[in-house]
Every structure is written in structure tokens, then in C-alpha cells.
């Protein structure tokens, strides 16, 4: 094949695209011809069960052609970069460097606090890695979105999850130096305030969700996994939205990052992972993190394209992101961009001396000096500045821009110094939408050391019970939950999604059959068998405005999702005021022939976490009411379902008891329609007594009631 004919000496966009198509087409034909002429009948030979050599090579060929096409598109975007692009990058990189310098000074010197001490906050500089700003210029940005905007509610741009040191990426999306400073010090102007004005920063990391910047977390893979969940939501909601998840080579070793990439590859999600090789994690070199030849190889196992770029070249960041976005929104799926770079500073401000060494020689610093010198010579600020001068930008224009950025950061620092510190008691605000946190003083004030005198307004008289069991016509515990799931799906329509393992056939214990019978099969999504990313995906869907209902099949398996529940879902509201309307159903409990790992009773794991709402209904009526009500809350809710109560043994519990009830579905739905709370967060007296109070939940409600009836025969009323 001949692909070059009367080609122009230089290409423009249309001619380059036409040439690329001809080149890829010729390459495709050539590879096919080579396979057929060289291997012939061997192509039909089975090389692994149910897969022929021809099919194996065909898939390799398809991947190779995708790689070639993406490479040519990167060339096109790279060559389309203008001086205007480069001036914006230089300005943003200068802003980042100025801000980093100021934050380091604040950390070193501290800012005076009301008690007379000094506090410098914390922070992570991006020295030599400022080229990340160019990612944003390839995205759909809305830097002027209002402060109360959220994705789908005033902000309709792309989303980014920066690493903790990617301050420049946040600035390029629309974050401001003052917001970054306020977040680093936790002052009242911080947008990491749990949604409470003047509460100050609860998280000294940065973020600006109103312009699409997801605040990072200390367990670093959480951000990538959550962004994967947001990409999952965009896929479900048919949104024209792209997602960027940044991670370092150290954090890329984590299981949750691999789980996230695996989900993205399995579902073809619109996301790119930017994996930055910093040459060292905190203190651990890359060779002790992974055996890959290049970090881009990590995408191979997940089945999507990856490539490597030089992190000191802003145009490479821009072109790579532009191609990843183009590919994803055309339906190509995820990509991974491996960035070779180096941080020219310690992991955090306090780490500089250990990393680089103190001028005194103690400590000497442990970083390799040859490596340091190599990357110092590639510092993007001076090298890219020199390129701009070569391209005709005047020194006067560059110096004016640099003076403007320096002045803007100085102005922000002045405003920071005038900003108030938060009042300590505000730290308790906004733990969930139902309640604030208690202080130790609150606990002491409630304690009197005396039994409560008998009340004349007790809801039930001694021996009187609040409910009864139905011998005929009642619902089992399982049926009540199934009906609630179907009613939630009907109520929320396309915003509702049910995710977990084995969901599309029937779900654990066949609980999804009612959804299928009610016409909601399209809302059931099978997920890879990895509980952490199932929960993270639910969090991302919730942040995107959906109403996800997550299933973890057994109580013991919730341990695999513990980080996702406790360090992600539970903290979102308290950290930065985000709604996370996600319900997580977890079957658990003994007397079910389940054994270890399945029957674990896990309420104590989560009930002590202030950001989670934990429900453990004991009756069909409570199961219906609480699941319906919990699914309306803007908080992460755990619905703990004792398997022994399901009624799997002919409608009886695991210990042979009938607990079926005639369930009233109207009352709770009326309360929901009126915006009123009903049962969630409240106790209920189910038997009146005078001698002792038993507080219990779940399956133990029935056993406690039996015990009370037995003791009543001895004259003891509970």
C-alpha cells in the first residue's frame, strides 16, 4: 500500500486528519494481509479454551491501531497549541509557584492565633510539576460558576480529582489563591467548611467543588475511586462530561486504585487516570513500588490505552488530556496518562529538610543528587518561559504578567491575615443532616446519676405492646424490603440505580426479583467483585445527583469497603458540606447457616462513626418504613438486615418464629411527601414496663420481647 502521494509540505487540521485516516487504514490492511499470508490455517487453531490464534491476534491488532490513532491525534493537538495557550499556562504556573512560595513561608513562620500561639497550617507544594495546569485548558471549564454550584446544579463542566499537590490544576479550573490559603490554614473563609458559613476548614486539603475540583483525601486512592464513581454516573445519566483522576506512583499501588481502573475498563467509563511518577513516594523509591517497565503498563491489564509523557512539557499535558477526552466522549472508554516528573520539594512543607537536606548539612537529605540536578534543569517555569521568548513574546509582557501574579498572591495573603479564625464549637456542626455532633460537655450535662421517675405520659402501659404479628396475610421481612426497593425505584425514576455483585440476575437471596417484576431491570447494575469500589461508585453517583442503593452481600464483606464508607462517604458532609444520598444494604447475622465472614454483626463498627446513619430494623413494618425514609436522606445510610429475619424458611425466622406483619405503606410515604421525619433517628417503645428498660434493635427485638413476656409471669415488667 502507498499512503503518501501528493501530500503538502505542511499539514493543516483537515489534511492531517485525512492523512491519519489513510495511514491507519493502510496499516490495518497491511497487518491483516501479513497475518493471513504468514499464518494461514494456523489462525483457526485454538490457543486457549474457546479462543483461536486469529481472534487473539485480531484483538492485539485492534489495540495497536487504537494506540496509533491516539498517537496521531496527540500530535495534532500538540501542533495546534498557540502562543495564547502557552501564555495562559505560563501565567497559571507562575501563580502556582508564587502561591506555593507564600504557603511555605506561612508554614515556616506561622500566623498568630487568638490564644497567642502561631499556626502555619499544612500544605503540599508542586515544585517542578506546575505543568499540570495545562490539563485544564483541554477541558470544559466553568471558572465563574457560583459558589453554591454543584455538578448538574449550576456547574455543567468536566470534573477533576487533583493530587494533594496539584494546586495548579485547581487554580486552572477556577479555584483562587485566597481559597487555597484559607483551606490550608482552616480559616473561616475556607470552602472546606462542612457547608456552614464561618465554620472554617475542617480539612486542610484544598478543593473547589463548585468549579468541578474534587477535594482530595489523605488516603490518596479515594479521590480516583470517587471520580470513577462520578464517571459511572455520567455513563448512567448519558452526560457529555469528562473526568480526570490524578494519582502518584506510590498511591497507584493501592488496591482501591486498581479496583477503580478495573471498573472503568469493564464499563468503558469516560475518564482518564493521570499517573505521575514523582521519582519517590513519601520516602519510598519507585523500584520498591512496582515492577512495571513504565507506569503506563498498569493500564494493560485493564484493557485500555496508555502512554507516557514528559511532565516538564505543558503542551504534552494539554495534548494528552485533549485526546483522552475526545476518545472517551466518542465512546472509546478510559485511558491512562503516565507522566514522568519529579517533585522538587519534600512530600509536605515539613519534609523539605529530610528530603533535600538542610543548608547546615544536618540532615544531609536522601534524594539522589544526579536525579535532582536532571529534573532541576527541566523546571517548567524557566524552560517554558525561554520558549515563549523564542516564540516572540517580549520580556516586558512576561515581567508584567509575573508582577501581576505576585501582586495577586500578596493581596490574597493580606486578605488571609484579616480573615477570622473559626470558633471551636463550630466543629460539631453538620455531621449528618439529622444532627450535629455531641461534645463531652453535652454528655456530662445529660448525666444525672439518678433513675428517671415513672412518667405519667408513658406511651404504653405496663405489659401493653405496640404491635403484633400476623398469622395470615402478612408480609415477611424480606418482602417488606423488596417492596420498599421497588417503591424507591418508582419514586426516583432514572436517578435511582441499584449496584452490587450479582445484581442483574436476582441479587443476594433473590431480593432483586421484586424490582425486576416491577419493570426496573434497567436499574440493576452488576459490579466487579470488589466492595470498596462498589461503595466508592455509589458515592460518586450520589455526588452526581443520583440516588444509588448499594448492596454488600454479607456483613463480613463490609470490612472490604470500610475505607470507602468511613473515610469517604461518612466524611463528605462534615468536610465540605456535600450531600451523599446513598443507601447501603447489608445482610448479616447468625442462625442463618452462613458461618464466619458472612454472619458478622457489624453495627458497632459503624454506629460510632459520626457521619453514617445506621439502621437495623427488626420488623417488616420498620424495614419498609426505614428503607423508604433512609433513601430520601442526603446522607450515607447503612441498612443492616438480619438474614434470620428474612423469612426464608417457609416465612419463619431462622429460629422458627413468625414475625410477619400487615405493613402500612401509606403513612411513611405521606410523611415523605410532606417533608416530615417519621422513624429514622428515633427510638420506639414497643412494650410498656415499670422495672427495667431494654434497648435493642434488629433480631434481638423479638427475643427481648419474649424475655419480657417470660419475666412478666414473675411480676417484673420490662
What are the functions of these language-model segments?
Residues 116-125, 166-168, 210-219, 470-472, ...:
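A short glycine/serine-rich beta->alpha loop
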Residues 1-133, 138, 143, 153, ...:
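Conserved acidic/glycine
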Residues 118-267, 285-303, 596-598, 605:
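Cofactor-binding active-site loop characterized by glycine-rich and histidine/acidic residues
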Residues 86-90, 119, 154-159, 176-181, ...:
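Short coil/turn connectors at secondary-structure junctions
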Residues 1, 212-411, 417-418, 607-718:
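Glycine-rich ThDP/TPP pyrophosphate-binding loop and its adjacent helix/strand module
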Residues 83, 100, 105-111, 197-210, ...:
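Residues forming anionic-ligand binding surfaces in small-molecule and nucleic-acid pockets
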Residues 134, 211-279, 309-327, 497, ...:
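Thiamine diphosphate
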Residues 189-207, 295-296, 505-518, 667-676:
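Acidic-glycine-rich active-site phosphate/pyrophosphate-binding loop
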Amino acid at each position: 500500500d502507498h499512503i503518501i502521494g501528493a501530500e503538502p509540505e505542511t499539514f493543516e487540521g483537515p489534511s492531517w486528519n485525512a492523512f491519519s485516516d489513510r495511514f491507519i487504514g493502510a496499516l490495518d490492511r497491511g497487518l491483516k494481509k501479513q497475518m493471513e499470508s504468514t499464518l494461514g490455517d494456523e489462525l483457526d487453531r485454538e490457543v486457549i479454551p474457546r479462543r483461536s490464534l486469529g481472534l487473539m491476534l485480531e484483538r492485539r491488532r485492534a489495540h495497536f491501531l487504537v494506540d496509533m490513532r491516539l498517537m496521531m491525534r496527540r500530535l495534532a493537538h500538540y501542533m495546534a497549541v498557540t502562543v495564547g495557550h502557552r501564555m495562559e499556562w505560563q501565567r497559571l504556573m507562575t501563580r502556582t509557584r508564587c502561591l506555593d512560595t507564600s504557603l511555605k513561608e506561612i508554614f515556616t513562620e506561622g500566623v498568630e492565633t487568638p490564644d497567642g500561639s502561631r499556626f502555619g497550617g499544612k500544605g503540599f507544594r508542586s515544585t517542578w510539576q506546575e505543568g499540570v495546569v495545562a490539563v485544564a485548558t483541554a477541558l470544559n471549564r466553568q471558572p465563574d460558576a457560583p459558589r453554591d454550584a454543584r455538578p448538574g446544579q449550576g456547574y455543567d463542566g468536566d470534573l477533576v480529582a487533583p493530587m494533594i499537590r496539584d494546586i495548579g490544576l485547581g487554580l486552572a479550573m477556577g479555584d483562587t489563591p485566597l481559597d487555597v490559603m484559607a483551606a490550608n490554614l482552616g480559616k473561616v473563609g475556607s470552602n472546606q467548611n462542612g457547608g456552614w458559613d464561618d465554620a472554617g476548614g475542617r480539612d486542610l486539603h484544598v478543593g473547589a467543588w463548585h468549579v468541578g475540583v474534587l477535594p482530595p483525601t489523605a488516603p490518596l486512592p479515594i479521590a480516583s475511586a470517587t471520580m470513577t464513581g462520578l464517571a459511572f454516573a455520567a455513563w448512567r445519566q448519558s452526560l457529555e462530561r469528562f473526568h480526570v483522576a490524578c494519582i502518584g506512583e506510590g498511591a497507584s499501588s493501592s488496591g482501591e486504585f486498581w479496583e477503580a481502573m478495573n471498573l472503568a475498563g469493564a464499563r468503558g467509563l469516560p475518564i482518564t487516570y493521570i499517573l505521575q511518577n514523582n521519582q519517590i513516594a513519601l520516602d519510598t523509591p519507585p523500584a520498591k513500588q512496582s515492577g512495571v517497565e513504565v507506569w503506563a503498563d498498569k493500564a494493560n491489564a485493564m484493557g485500555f490505552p496508555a502512554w507516557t509523557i514528559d511532565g516538564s512539557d505543558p503542551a504534552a499535558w494539554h495534548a494528552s488530556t485533549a485526546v483522552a477526552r475526545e476518545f472517551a466522549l466518542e465512546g472509546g472508554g478510559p485511558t491512562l496518562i503516565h507522566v514522568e516528573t519529579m517533585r522538587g520539594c519534600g512530600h509536605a512543607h515539613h519534609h523539605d529538610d529530610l528530603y533535600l537536606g538542610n543548608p547546615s548539612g544536618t540532615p544531609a537529605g536522601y534524594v539522589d543528587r544526579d536525579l535532582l540536578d536532571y529534573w532541576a534543569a527541566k523546571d517548567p517555569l524557566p524552560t517554558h518561559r525561554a520558549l515563549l521568548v523564542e516564540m516572540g513574546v517580549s520580556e516586558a509582557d512576561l515581567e508584567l504578567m509575573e508582577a501581576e501574579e505576585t501582586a495577586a498572591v500578596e493581596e490574597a495573603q493580606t486578605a488571609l491575615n484579616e480573615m477570622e479564625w473559626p470558633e471551636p464549637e463550630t466543629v460539631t456542626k453538620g455531621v449528618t443532616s439529622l444532627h450535629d455532633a455531641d461534645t463531652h460537655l453535652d454528655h456530662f450535662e445529660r448525666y444525672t446519676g439518678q433513675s428517671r421517675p415513672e412518667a405519667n405520659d408513658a406511651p404504653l402501659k405496663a405489659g401493653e405492646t405496640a404491635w403484633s404479628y400476623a398469622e395470615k396475610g402478612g408480609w415477611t421481612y424480606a418482602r417488606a424490603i423488596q417492596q420498599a426497593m421497588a417503591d424507591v425505584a418508582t419514586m426516583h425514576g432514572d436517578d435511582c440505580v441499584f449496584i452490587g455483585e450479582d445484581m442483574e440476575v436476582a441479587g443476594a437471596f433473590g431480593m432483586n426479583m421484586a424490582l425486576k417484576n416491577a419493570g426496573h431491570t434497567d436499574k440493576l447494575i452488576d459490579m466487579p467483585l470488589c466492595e470498596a469500589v462498589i461503595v466508592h461508585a455509589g458515592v460518586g453517583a450520589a455526588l452526581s445527583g443520583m440516588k444509588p442503593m448499594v448492596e454488600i452481600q454479607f456483613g463480613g464483606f463490609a470490612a472490604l469497603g470500610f475505607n470507602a464508607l468511613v473515610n469517604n462517604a461518612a466524611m463528605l458532609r462534615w468536610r465540605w458540606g456535600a450531600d451523599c444520598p446513598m443507601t447501603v444494604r447489608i445482610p448479616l447475622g447468625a442462625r442463618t447457616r452462613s458461618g464466619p465472614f458472612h454472619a458478622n454483626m457489624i453495627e458497632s463498627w459503624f454506629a460510632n462513626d459520626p457521619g453514617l446513619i445506621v439502621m437495623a430494623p427488626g420488623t417488616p413494618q420498620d424495614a419498609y418504613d426505614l428503607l423508604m425514609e433512609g433513601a430520601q436522606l442526603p446522607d450515607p445510610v447503612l441498612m443492616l438486615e438480619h438474614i434470620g429475619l428474612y423469612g426464608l424458611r417457609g416465612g419463619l425466622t431462622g429460629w422458627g418464629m413468625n414475625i410477619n406483619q400487615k405493613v402500612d405503606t401509606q403513612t411513611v410515604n405521606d410523611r415523605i411527601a410532606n417533608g416530615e421525619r417519621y422513624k429514622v433517628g428515633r427510638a420506639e417503645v414497643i412494650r410498656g414496663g415499670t422495672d427495667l428498660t431494654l434497648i435493642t434493635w434488629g433480631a434481638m427485638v423479638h427475643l427481648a420481647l419474649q424475655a419480657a413476656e417470660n419475666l412478666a409471669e414473675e411480676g417484673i415488667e420490662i
